[in-house]
Amino acid sequence: FVVSTTMAFAWPGISPYAYCLNNPIKVIDPDGRNPIYDADGNFLGTDDLGLQGNYYVMDKGGFTQGMSHLEAGNHAIMGDLPAEIAKKIGIHYADLPNRPDYDGFVTIQEGIDWAKSHPYALQNPTPDNALYIDAAQLDFGHLSTSNFAETGIATPVNLFNVSNTIGSLGNPRLMATIYALGRVDMMLLNREQRTVRVVNGNATAYDWNQGGGAVRNSCIMLNNVIFNINPKVHGFRANYYGVGVLRK
């Protein structure tokens, strides 16, 4: 690779041009997280560990958004890239820290700003106009393992409820979670560990369309007036990765 890593500051004793510490067999990703590009240098998305860290390059056909980190490594293309492809990736990669989702968490204002700066993104979704959100950083409020009859099964849940709404006052992380997700499918992974995954789909789109009850519709209408949101224009795809943990 001929492009230095923007994370070079994290390893001051290592050359910024030393891809995988010069040992891609044993150290495919020193930071443990990474964006993914195809062999033509196009951004594809992320594995289950997010945007940060050194990038992978793989054939587009082997990529699935949110795929496991191990699986992504198994599909990675080893060896040097053509200079023009490496440059293309390097330019895009260097700009990733400027994205609001680079840290894995998106505030309400960041979501609104992204929607306004990317009109019609939901109608024309691309890896670049989507946001990538880490489930580990979400607060699911009063949702508990008792809301899931089985593990490993997509289960519809309603995060926008009275107890969570009250609990979100003074808790911006919970407020951002219920604002973004509302009614959504989730999966309980381990009952003892209280681990869950957000099931990506139409319900995880970051939008302001009405539906799902009079209270929700009233809140959305008020929100759209306050923030000048046009639901026909504003909205984007949100891809949730990683594993979240319930409070109980």
What feature does the model see in each segment?
Residues F1-A76:
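Short turn/helix-capping motifs enriched in Asx and small/polar residues
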Residues Y37-D38, G45-D48, H75, D80, ...:
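Catalytic toxin/effector domains delivered as secreted proteins or via bacterial secretion systems
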